[in-house]
A protein has these predicted regions:
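A conserved beta-strand element that flanks and buttresses the S-adenosyl-L-methionine
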Residues: 99
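Short alpha-helix
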Residues: 155-169
Length: 238
């Protein structure tokens, strides 16, 4: 599995405004309270569920799992360095919310099918699974040419993943989370150099530098776009 170390490190995704907007979206779709048990698969630094914990005043810390352990993890969460399939092989907890935000595409298709079957077995009776992926059509992320090519290939695979989810959970609910991004170009260039998205991970440094030059020429100093995510909501009674 690929490790994305900087997706939530000094990006709009780590901003208070984004996290508040994201958590507002989640809570609009699923009622949670201080007794709720929450799991975030691929939690990164855990800022999203950490903030959610404070907002709900959770009795028990939300659990975040990831294959990368960051030194600056949110202290409001309980963290385990483990992959999802290994975690569920021994887990006994029934969760009210399982969150998978922009990480399911890092698994191979067989692993995804196994994970989807395991998820419902680890939900409470009224629990929900939220799976977020990038918008697969007309995606507006600022890109350079090679990044765009790789992103389109990745989004094509995401469509396959969404079809697999629909086959296993035919009554799933589909929503969209849209966040209006406004970022200074030099900050976005740093994100590119830090390989904030999986499509950049395997690119040689030479191609990254070319891409930085291309984006620097292509975009204005203040970059504005809509960051769109597809949210698939699954429940226990399928």
């Amino acid at each position: 599995m690929l490790e994305i170390k900087n997706w939530d490190n000094k990006t709009w995704i780590s901003s208070r405004k984004y996290i508040k907007s994201f958590n507002n979206f989640v809570l609009k779709q699923k009622k949670l309270n201080k007794s709720s048990k929450i799991l975030d698969i691929g939690c990164g630094r855990g800022k999203i569920i950490g903030t959610l914990s404070s907002r709900l005043r959770l009795k028990n810390k939300p659990l975040g799992i990831d294959i990368t352990s960051h030194k600056d993890k949110d202290k409001r969460i309980k963290f385990r360095k483990i992959d999802a399939l290994s975690f569920f092989s021994t887990n006994k907890i029934k969760f009210d919310l399982i969150l998978i935000k922009q990480t399911i595409h890092l698994l191979n298709l067989n692993e995804i099918k196994k994970l989807l079957n395991l998820l419902k077995k680890n939900l409470s009776p009224n629990g929900r699974i939220f799976i977020f992926t990038l918008e697969t059509d007309n995606n507006k992320l600022p890109t350079f040419r090679l990044m765009k090519t790789r992103l389109m290939k990745s989004l094509k695979r995401d469509k396959k993943i969404l079809k697999i989810i629909t086959r296993l959970y035919p009554y799933r609910i589909k929503k969209k989370f849209i966040y209006k991004v406004e970022i200074i170009k030099k900050n976005y260039l740093k994100m590119i150099q830090n390989r904030y998205i999986s499509t950049l991970l395997s690119l040689p440094k030479k191609e990254i530098l070319k891409g930085v030059e291309e984006i620097n020429f292509k975009y204005k100093n203040n970059i504005k776009f809509n960051d769109k995510l597809i949210c698939v909501i699954l429940k226990n009674a399928y």
